[in-house]
């Protein structure tokens, strides 16, 4: 539509029919019209014209329905909450459990009457310490069993004196308190006597084969490779800095503690760092040593642990503890129902047990990773009602010594460990119910533990002679014993538990022929598998009676009082009775007896 106004008159500002020239057509308009005759009407305000630079205004984003419900909004439209169903705890107390019927296995082989062979060791590295003036050879354990994936492994030996359970507990050389081959990662290297450990990899932890359950026990650890002393540092690099040849951490740990990290990273371990002498628990480091003091090569650290009697411990985990009437003094002795739900199997040429291991509880795992000092379910205490794993032991503590000098007691009120504070990972019956997760196998407690990093190495002594003698008694008059004494005590406990299992199996499954070991009798007179009483009389290494052997030969010694290490290229198989082996103890003869023809219908007699 054409405009009715003259060419020079101003255009009405409100007319929508006014010509609006686009900037692209500006050159054409300038050629046909004069500069003074052009008029532009103002464009109506619009959001798009204000965003010519590409900047868009922010849009108020509304939270989703789930977020609003989580924040407590939209209560009217929120769906009703589901009623929580209480899960019944089907676990049976350890005192009420009985033996499980063993899994049907074949008759024991003749080779099962022999003790397990010594572990094969391959040389890995040699460590030398200028401060101590000594060197150590470390070896890699070949084809070893490792406690992992919720299972724990031990060794068995066939015994004719146990016709119902057929096998009893035993161990591998060396026969003394030491670091456990099975309770350590594959990266851990051992000395020949298994008293020193090291690793060239990141943090790994090795636990001992003895544990403390009650009483006061002590062990010492000497740093072989770690933070160098000031004299060595000045000589090596000419400065006052203290370089290191690795790092170590020392302490105590339970079976739930992870072995691929350092001791003290969770609630199941208590440790001390070599750097600044800091103590560690729940991943929290606290200063303990005086400022500027560390643990260096050649230092000897003494670890003293004190635990209350098992009678008081049971009251705490059962929830019947009363601080007004229950004290730290041991009460009347009570029997402990040791339940070992084990599955026998052959591994290589040895016979082994597989049993459930304990696993970390959710409460302690959450508490370890919780940044708050006081969790929502209450602080750990002997009277914590949330969960037995959160209960602590009154009167328990860990005291640390350095070179014979008491540095203090950084840890008190240790966590309880008796079931149900500790639970088996696979404590289920045939129906999948966790009825047996509270079973106590007699080896749940606090173990000496050492962590190594990047070449750090530690040597331990679990019994005398000590580098620095421990105190004879605690401040409360409790006698102090070397934790190595637990080794012989554990042997007695194992033999007693085997006898109880045999008697219970005989009563439960009566009318079973006792001669079920396939008449596997040693033919040489006086030579055979030793029963429980013989082990107690003859000692740990008395798997054979050397006084009754027909011919003997001296065992090859390595100069340290123990038998030589079996190399990887040697034959590791049990071929028969003529294939005998050294037991790893000094002056133990090796029998060389030809195998006579097996007598017919030879009756078996119980020892």
Swiss-Prot record:
UniProt key word Nucleus: yes
Cystine bridges: none
Compositional bias (Basic residues): 57-69
Protein name as annotated: COMPASS component cclA
GO molecular function: transcription cis-regulatory region binding
Subunit (UniProt): Component of the COMPASS complex.
Chief location: nucleus
UniProt subcellular location: Nucleus; Chromosome, Telomere
Bias kind Low complexity: ranges: 1-19
Membership in a protein family: Belongs to the cclA family.
Lineage: Eukaryota, Fungi, Dikarya, Ascomycota, Pezizomycotina
Xref: SUPFAM superfamilies: Concanavalin A-like lectins/glucanases
GO terms under cellular component: chromosome, telomeric region; Set1C/COMPASS complex
PROSITE patterns: B302_SPRY
Organism for this UniProt entry: Emericella nidulans (strain FGSC A4 / ATCC 38163 / CBS 112.46 / NRRL 194 / M139)
One of the protein's GO biological processes: regulation of secondary metabolite biosynthetic process
